[in-house]
Regions:
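A conserved SF2-helicase RecA2
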Residues: 274-283, 287-349
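Conserved Helicase C-terminal RecA-like lobe
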Residues: 98-120, 125, 138-259, 330-349
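Conserved P-loop NTPase motor "coupling/switch" region that bridges the ATPase
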Residues: 20-100, 291
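Conserved nucleotide-binding/hydrolysis micro-motifs of P-loop NTPases
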Residues: 38-44, 56-59, 72-73, 118-121, ...
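Single conserved hydrophobic/aromatic residue that forms the stacking wall/gate
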Residues: 1-12, 17
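Short, Asp-centered acidic motifs that coordinate Mg2+ and/or phosphate
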Residues: 31, 246-247, 266
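Substrate-gripping "pore-loop 1 plus following alpha2 helix"
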Residues: 13-14, 18-24, 276
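A short beta-strand element within the Helicase C-terminal
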Residues: 46-49, 259-272, 295-300
Length: 349
């Protein structure tokens, strides 16, 4: 796992085995095996890359598969055809299968809802009006860029008005998520347990850490992509050590892969990545071999907002695809018509 490009076997040998082979090159070998925990991490093209190594031509060429995957947004029943095609080539083992790991505790996942504050409601309504006017006069690549940018703004606003506005302060009462975070973490503190708080935004890691320090009455830790490798190792060792370090705030990308943080048995996704595979990888920093307690996972959502509606749509997609298709990021949202987008963005109180 430490050497994802390591190839076991030589060119021209009987068998090649690759680990995490999302960017594979042609190798001359008769038998091929790929080991991966996330066959589809960000987009369907990940799956095509794997099968282009395993069985070239099975899923067509890259352009053909791209056209096919685009159609799935409008015709989800096509997932069943794809599942049927690739099923004979996949041997899947889940950690939750007791025949695979007999002593792994339970994972309890729940959606945790927060109400917007009055300030958030006002800003949300203003942002919706602004976006409506903007997308009406744009098209093509520019329109898609505006939609993705708008989604980011909504996420920031749903986290905290100060994150969206780029101001300081981060008052608790101005964010429904901060209020819910206190409620959950006070219970964790009473039990002297530990929690991982994931966010996709580096800029809110420090405000979250300061807020949590007030709840736990002691300092926690922060881990994001800007922290040097040497310090990252010390940070992980400190969290996993015998001293009570109650929390770690992590950026989703920096903390999503390759870390062992089993001292925590609570995981909070403060904002959503909208990709089940990425979120599950982050959760698995705590829910993995070595964990002795049941792991409780909270996925924060603000009620009546774009967060709640996208989550509902993804649940429906997940049921249709039955986990063969993890996600296409947020790009599928950019293909929506104007009226569909406005219905997605509108605030329902």
């Amino acid at each position: 796992r430490r050497h994802p490009r390591l190839v076991v076997g030589l060119v021209g040998s009987e068998m090649c085995i690759r680990d995490r082979a999302r960017t594979v090159k042609s190798l001359s070998c008769r038998n091929r095996i790929i080991m991966t925990g996330t066959p589809i991490e960000n987009r369907l093209a990940d799956l095509w890359s794997l099968f282009d190594f395993l069985n070239p031509g099975l899923l067509g060429n890259a352009n053909e598969f791209k056209k096919f995957s685009k159609k799935l947004n409008h015709n989800p029943s096509g997932y069943s055809r794809l599942r049927k095609l690739i099923r004979p080539y996949i041997l899947r083992r889940l950690k939750t299968d007791k025949t695979v790991i007999s002593d792994l505790p339970e994972k309890i996942e729940m959606r945790t809802y927060a109400a917007l504050s009055k300030k958030q409601i006002l800003l949300y309504k203003n942002l919706t009006v602004e976006i409506k006017e903007t997308i009406a006069r744009t098209e093509g690549i520019q329109r898609r860029g505006i939609i993705l940018s708008s989604l980011m703004k909504f996420k920031q606003l749903c986290n905290h008005p100060d994150q969206y506005l780029g101001t300081g302060g981060y008052g608790e009462k101005e964010s429904g998520k901060f209020v819910r975070l206190r409620e959950i973490c006070e219970t964790i503190y009473e039990k002297r347990e530990k929690v991982l708080v994931f966010t996709q935004f580096k800029e809110i890691t420090q405000p979250l850490a300061e807020f949590l320090a007030g709840i736990f009455q002691r300092q926690g830790l922060i881990l994001h992509g800007g922290i040097p490798v040497g310090k990252r190792k010390k940070t992980i060792e400190q969290f996993q050590g015998p001293a009570y370090v109650p929390f770690m705030v992590l950026s989703l990308k920096a903390g999503g892969v390759g870390l062992n943080l089993t001292e925590a048995n609570h995981v909070i996704h403060f904002d959503r990545w909208w990709n089940p595979a990425v979120e599950n990888q982050a959760t698995d920093r705590a829910f993995r071999i070595g964990q002795k307690k049941n792991v409780v996972v909270h996925k924060f959502l603000t009620k009546g907002t774009v967060e709640e509606r996208i989550d509902m749509m993804l649940q429906e997609k997940s049921r249709l695809s039955q986990d063969v298709i993890a996600a296409a990021g947020e790009s599928w949202i950019t293909e929506m018509k104007d009226d569909q987008l406005l219905d997605l963005f509108k605030l329902t109180l």
